[in-house]
């Protein structure tokens, strides 16, 4: 974002705005950051950059709470993963457990046997 330092935030792309939001939050040096749909509307190339930054910050001790419907992103970023449906927690586990649990499959795909 260095080359865009003087650009008004409203002129940035969706992905650039997400990176700017993350940078603004980091100024306060938080220990926990909530990300609500961090990849929504973001160019896939910038999603990769965003993921790299999140992983790097997590390794430095920053905790992230991620609300996301993109399961590929969730699987790559989060451990543990908590799955909610209709406002209720239905599962907590690692990516493999979440991926194969019938309650999760039913919550997101419906009864596939029907």
Language model: regions and residue ranges:
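Helical segment within the ABC ATPase nucleotide-binding domain
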Residues: 47-60
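H-loop/switch region of ABC-family ATPase nucleotide-binding domains
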Residues: 68-69
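Catalytic Walker B motif of ABC-type/P-loop ATPase nucleotide-binding domains
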Residues: 33-37
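Conserved catalytic motifs of ABC-family nucleotide-binding domains
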Residues: 29
């Amino acid at each position: 974002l260095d080359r865009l330092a003087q650009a008004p935030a409203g002129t940035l792309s969706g992905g650039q705005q997400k990176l700017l939001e993350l940078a603004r939050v980091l100024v306060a040096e938080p220990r926990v950051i909530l990300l609500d749909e961090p990849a929504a509307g973001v160019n896939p190339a910038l999603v990769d950059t965003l993921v790299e930054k999140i992983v790097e910050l997590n390794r430095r001790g920053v905790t992230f709470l991620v609300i996301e419907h993109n399961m590929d992103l969730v699987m790559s970023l989060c451990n543990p993963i908590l799955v909610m449906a209709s406002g209720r927690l239905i599962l907590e586990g690692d990516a493999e457990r979440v991926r194969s649990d019938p309650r999760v499959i039913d919550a997101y795909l419906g009864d596939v046997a029907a």
